[in-house]
From Swiss-Prot:
Keywords: Ribonucleoprotein, Ribosomal protein, RNA-binding, rRNA-binding. It comes from Campylobacter fetus subsp. fetus (strain 82-40). The gene is rpsO. This is Small ribosomal subunit protein uS15. One of the primary rRNA binding proteins, it binds directly to 16S rRNA where it helps nucleate assembly of the platform of the 30S subunit by binding and bridging several RNA helices of the 16S rRNA. SUPFAM superfamilies: S15/NS1 RNA-binding domain (SSF47060). Pfam families: Ribosomal_S15 (PF00312). NCBIfam families: S15_bact (TIGR00952). InterPro entries: Ribosomal_uS15, Ribosomal_uS15_bac-type, uS15_NS1_RNA-bd_sf.
Length: 90
């Protein structure tokens, strides 16, 4: 379920704060969102793949923590990111 390097580089370039930025919360959330959507599609086909379901829950939890951090530190960037990714605000 890993992303190929070309797609990952495209996402990093789109959400990076500056050139070479791979660790900012915006980039991490965007990468996690892409992985979550791909894994969700996999689980719609393979309903009994419980180990992948557990991995999906871990990814969602990690994304939730990063979004909580981003909301506390930089609310403007948070609102822009969730609008661009199509994520609901709690």
């Amino acid at each position: 379920m890993a992303l190929d390097s070309a797609k990952k580089a495209e996402i990093v370039a789109k959400f990076a704060r500056k050139s070479g930025d791979t660790g900012s919360p915006e980039v991490q959330v965007a990468l996690l969102t892409t992985r979550i959507s791909e894994l969700t599609g996999h689980l719609k086909i393979n309903k009994k793949d419980f180990s992948s379901r557990l991995g999906l829950l871990k990814l969602v939890g990690r994304r939730k923590r990063l979004l909580k951090y981003l909301k506390a530190k930089n609310y403007e960037s948070y609102t822009k990111l969730i609008a661009e990714l199509g994520i609901r605000d709690k």
